Amino acid sequence: LTVIGRDPIVGQKRIMTEARFMTKAAAGPLPDLWNDAHAADLDEPGLLLYRSNLLGSDLRITNFGGGNTSAKLTMTDPLTRKPVTVLWVKGSGGDLGSMKRDGFSTLYLDKLESLKQLYRGIAHEDEMVALFNHCTFNLNPRATSIDTALHGFVPHPHVDHVHADAVIAIAACSNAEELTEKVFGGAIGFLPWQRPGFDLGLKLGAMAAEHPEYVGVVLGGHGLFTWGPTSKAAYQTTLRIIQQAADWLAGHEKQPAFGGPRRDAAAPETRRAVAAALMPLIRGKISRDERKVGHFTDAPEVLEFVNSRALDRLAPLGTSCPDHFLRTKIRPLVLPYDRQGDNVDTLANSLDALLAAYRDDYSAYYQRCKRPNSPDMRDPNAVIYLVPGIGMFSFAKDKATARIASEFYVNAINVMRGASGVSAYVGLPEQEAFDIEYWLLEEAKLQRMPKAESLAGRIAYVTGAAGGIGGATALRLLGDGACVVLADIDHAALDARIQAVVQKFGRDSAVGIPLDVTDEASVVASFQESILAYGGIDIVVSNAGIASASPVEDTSLALWQKNMDVLATGYFLVAREAFRLMQRQQCGGAIVFVASKNGLAASVGASAYCAAKASEIHLARCLALEGAPHGIRVNTVNPDAVLRGSKIWAGEWRQQRAASNKVSEDELEEVYRQRSLLKLSVLPEDIAEGVYFFASDLSAKSTGNILNVDAGNAQAFTR
């Protein structure tokens, strides 16, 4: 097992297996993580939350955001002070593995039951969702899920609904009902595919009532419902049924999987190199209207599928479970790298035609299936890109969405593997898939989402990110929605910085990459790592720095060269790689140099530093000329005397400057404050604001410019 992800409330990890259907031993049995000692201290809602977090902690049980749980509990009515039965059910949105107690909606069960009298038939079932609000218990603001009726009408106290790959594999077979009987021996019922809603809730409730011997029901093409008398019993039943399905599949699937390999996977380094070459090209071509962020995986199950004989047959069939194609679109785009001689340039030259063909196909699908009240067609570009020999890319509005889409398509691969191994895999009918994708209730959910932040979909690369200015800049860009690559030569400081950033913004928001800007190979490698992490780069902030002070007669060649290596050559190497990438990506870009007042104003005893900083400023001007035809803007922010949080000012440079000004180190910041025209201290956050201005569309018509952030220094006035 490979452990990834997060800690639910009892410290369990989210788990993903690399081969769920190979053998029971290979996949490993689902662990029963229920802890009686922990559970003993919980009330009934707490037990429901505990069960939910446990189920959501394992991707074999349910995917991110998928599934829901419920409990029918006796509570005191706040108006009558009498006991009433209340349905606690996971609300709309959220994720079982990470949800909190406020993630449940609560409804009077008798009021929910009374809605049956108002139901006008399947053509009108969407109107029932609004009526759920009239059943709310205790003014709970949590929006109710479309699956509420499926939980409420099952006549059992505790109900689980999950999207386990092993069960969906059976549910997506052409003979799913027959296999359900064969696998579970009459303990589990079967309902054919139907869009979730009030009507399916009535059918599920009726089946559970008519068959007291059932402990659950398989929903065709969708997933599993199970139930029990207690939270623990329901949880253990869910585990047992999923394990039973996985064991049966492992014992009956045909070998080799997917008809065997059509080709071998490329070597790992080749896969990474090809991915780094292709992802910016794709990203640029699909980001014309909205910037996309990418995700790359070459996990074993992905390689098995993209390299298989069954790829061309199965990929066009689309996914089955609604949760899958809501994230991944109905089908992926296969990029025929293997049929073009494993040649990246050949594939790159055909990308425009391949992407256009996918968009045309998606548009035709929309036109075939749309209804009079369907929402307008959404982005017609693919989300999932399969590359034989290489792996899978996914692109979406942000990193988390792209990663989760990738995880969902891995779920779909597992389902196709299991179903095709024991029967024939069947995707959802096209019209059914469309009706889910363009469901008015789903559209309403999209419309409720907050407006995107100003840097949403942008990817920034910041050097010197472990220091004061670099760290503040990273936080500023992250705060406005960018994904950020934090690069620094100080591994320990970088690790501490990235941990703090991830703690605040989440694991998809940022990556840390060790970088020596004076080492060409290190710079090139850091850009490849950045592409593999996010698919490209839009914003580059060159901020890596050193500082030195020495009279010219005492300045050694080594000291001179060190300043030039870091502050001139380092900025050149980063800018060159940025230009190469941004030109391939073809959607412009913003490069910001963090230089210094000393690049404009001469300073006694710091000739090497001043000359190197002047080099940065003029290099930026030259790059602005070269970048303009490509939409690449290059600007400079000039700080002065930013002491707080600075690694540069923490060492000899501070001592030297204090000695030069004939004050103590503690008095130095006040000296600089009084020296400024505005009598203000300049902080890292002030520089970050300047960088943000040049990185964002606020300065869309600005290039080749210098912004002094120094509280006013007449020597540095640009002329």
Task: Give residue ranges: language-model regions.
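Short C-terminal tail/terminal secondary-structure segment
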Residues: 601, 691, 703-719
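Substrate-binding pocket helix/loop in short-chain dehydrogenase/reductase
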Residues: 551-552, 556-561, 672
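Active-site helix of classical SDR
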Residues: 575, 612, 620
